[in-house]
């Protein structure tokens, strides 16, 4: 389809990014990207189930809590709480076009199949992009060495039904938009959704 870009189908160049944004192309996950994501996910699930050793941030806490083991039934809660605790940016709202770029770039990065996420998580990012559900992200605040943890947490809070978004030009609670747009809440599980 001409008006669709298949995320994970190849290199994402500046020219292609510009075309996706300027021509308002819809995003779909390429079949080969789904396979890569699922393969990595399957590995993570297997490793988590079979490993007697702690896996940092997956079966343990973070930072000074790295020696605290997390029970299998609390792994989803750990990931959800991580997103919530890191959503601490402040300042001015980032413009919607930048939010779209952030979603596109994160979906592309996840489509490479190196993170352990669920395919459905990446699909939800594409659903937000395609339906112009724009999470509200603020321009100040950082955590960690990369400095992107706070903005990314704000960007993806709405995937779990928390936080605010712009939808059809109005600021709304994410949970209400998820109900309206038939985009279902992603439930975080082991490692990054």
Q: Where are the regions a protein language model picked out?
A:
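N- or domain-start disorder-to-order transition segments that initiate the globular core
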Residues: 1-52
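Single conserved hydrophobic/aromatic residue that forms the stacking wall/gate
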Residues: 183-193
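Glycine-/small-residue-rich beta-strand-loop submotif within the FAD-binding core of flavoenzymes
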Residues: 11-12, 16-19, 23, 68-97, ...
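Catalytic cores of large soluble enzymes that bind and process phosphate-bearing ligands
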Residues: 5-9, 28-36, 67-74, 90-94, ...
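An N-terminal structural lobe/cap that precedes and organizes the functional/catalytic core
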Residues: 37, 44-81
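Structural motif
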Residues: 26, 53-56, 101, 134-135, ...
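Anion-binding (especially nucleotide phosphate/pyrophosphate-binding) glycine-rich loop
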Residues: 45-49, 75-137
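Conserved phosphate/anionic-ligand binding catalytic regions in large, soluble enzymes, centered on
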Residues: 54-70, 139-159
């Amino acid at each position: 389809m001409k008006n669709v870009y298949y995320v994970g189908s190849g290199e994402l160049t500046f020219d292609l990014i510009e075309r996706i944004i300027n021509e308002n192309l819809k995003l779909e996950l390429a079949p080969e990207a789904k396979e890569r994501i699922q393969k990595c996910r399957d590995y993570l699930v297997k490793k988590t189930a079979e490993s007697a050793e702690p896996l940092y941030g997956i079966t343990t806490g973070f930072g000074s809590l790295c020696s605290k083991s997390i029970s299998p039934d609390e792994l989803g809660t750990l990931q959800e709480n991580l997103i919530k605790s890191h959503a601490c940016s402040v300042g001015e709202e980032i413009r919607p076009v930048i939010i779209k770029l952030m979603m596109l770039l994160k979906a592309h990065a996840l489509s490479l199949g190196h993170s352990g996420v669920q395919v459905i998580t990446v699909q939800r990012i594409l659903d937000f992009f395609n339906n112009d559900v724009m999470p509200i992200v603020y321009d100040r605040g950082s955590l960690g060495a990369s400095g992107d943890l706070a903005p990314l947490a704000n960007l993806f809070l709405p995937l779990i039904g928390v936080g605010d978004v712009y939808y059809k030009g109005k600021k709304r609670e994410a949970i209400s938009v998820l109900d309206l747009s038939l985009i279902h809440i992603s439930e975080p599980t082991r490692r990054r959704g």
